[in-house]
């Protein structure tokens, strides 16, 4: 039973409020006060260098109010998506007094909501993106770049409330962006559901700065942006629209655009399409100076604001007095229709600097041209000049962007299709292969960025076939460590952040994965050649349409090796295996895009590349987080893989056993034994040497990620479980379960 303790001072305060009667209670309800009850200091306060294991505990099932039994895919399948779209479309022009729509249409507002939800995605580590609807939580709900989007989500609440659990906030926000575009005359490329909601904020490194929109701490050298970041400042989605650090230079801004959009996996054509397409709609808001008018962001606002922020005390507080970015104006004459007016204006006028009423640098046509071209969003009869940001002019001034923008201007159909495809990519980039898509509105064609995998068009092998194939693999001459290493290298490329990688597709046999240093290319080639031979021979013996893919053979090889290793250690082990993987081709694989999945470290193989800025232990936690592992799963996998002798390049660091290649718990037993003492190596400060405490004889070598399981108090507590005298069966079962989980992370067809 869960017991929530109450701090002593809080308990006293509660007792006083009850005994004082309703007068005190009413006073409390009407008062504005800060909660000053004492807060416990975290261990990080005292020991800031302590290894943080919290990423492995985030998004616990206990946080989900729907519980383990809820099947979102099943719930989503009950939706009448066309009716949902009709309800959303009706919302577009249902003006609300508390937040009036610009030009009588909420479409541009909802496009910004969807864009800023999806646009946090970064290709370097797959974090960010639309999945989870993280825009509802801190820090994203309070970023300066997301001012007013709290109102967009509140406008959408009646639709969410109506359809309940059948559509997640994450899916609804993206679908609403699509409907917004369609309601203004644009033909979208499609929509797929499948984004489940999160119930707490992601633990994400958004940058080193401690203030919003300040500093260049994330840059070094010749404006080199720190990895894995994909925005120029803390609190921005991409770039500063006024130019780098507010400097209104379109060419310098183009460099920032190319870098940040590239880190979101967009090429130049997609970047131009997104900027030009997105700025066809709506307007920027900077009617007054934010510092003089806006209240606290949602995370800092009072409880009476009910999750809303940036309360505006100037003028009406909304409509023509709205403040978001501080820039003010519209790009197009008709901001609620799909047109080429953005490009018409970009190339049709020369532009001069001006400032918005809020003091932000922006651009208008020179010499007062077109000063009455654009209607006001709220005041009838009032008109304005069109505007451009510094970053808009980058599309005109940068030579490569200009070529693309001119081409789009001359061919509106090409522009429309390019924007449709780029928008679909923007809003679906973090969902992985099409196998994870829900609904029937997604495009049928395979897109390279989706990491396509062929459909199963053959009969799967049965249990008898599996047993025969395991024998053939074990008789091939490959060792247990080789088979385990190869299966792990294939499956552990998976990233739970954007559902990319994994064993399905056998991309470990393709560029670039086959030449990743962590995969030991020389050994990998020999193993793959042997497994391909086994696969071909086996398929030749099969009858009918029965077939086994290389991807399945690789995973089954790991399973067979673990079963043998368990048997050699005295355990009867069965590793679950589900056939059904297929093999991708090199043509289906974007080499540049897949290069971002290359591990810079893999503690499970005791691999750590040179030039790393992050510690081995931190890399270990990050890798485990990407594999969606818990602390116990990470622990048992590291210990088991050490005993299986599965280290990178046959290293013996952490192999604390006299029987390498067998499945045993010796790693934990010997690591925690007081018979051994550890010292840093005099030859290599990254290596530790283990000595017999009595004889002084050196017995083992280890790395940080080996010894951390004995030095970190939390990891040691888990390691002790697997070192106990009664731990044999639990260790084996837990290892097999965790191993199988990793092997099946990308099997969306099984979920």
Curated annotation (Swiss-Prot):
Gene Ontology BP annotations: cellular response to hydrogen peroxide; hydrogen peroxide catabolic process
Active site per database record: 116
Residue numbers binding heme b: 279
Record-annotated site: Transition state stabilizer: 112
Cofactor note: Binds 1 heme b (iron(II)-protoporphyrin IX) group per dimer.
Enzyme Commission number: 1.11.1.21
Annotated keywords: Heme, Hydrogen peroxide, Iron, Metal-binding, Oxidoreductase, Peroxidase, Signal
Signal peptide start-end: 1-27
Covalent cross-link site, Tryptophyl-tyrosyl-methioninium (Trp-Tyr) (with M-264): 115-238
Pfam families noted in UniProt: peroxidase
NCBIfam families for this protein: cat_per_HPI, PRK15061.1
HAMAP family: Catal_peroxid
Description of how the protein assembles with itself and partners: Homodimer or homotetramer.
Annotated protein name in UniProt: Catalase-peroxidase 2
Organism: Idiomarina loihiensis (strain ATCC BAA-735 / DSM 15497 / L2-TR)
GN (gene name): katG2
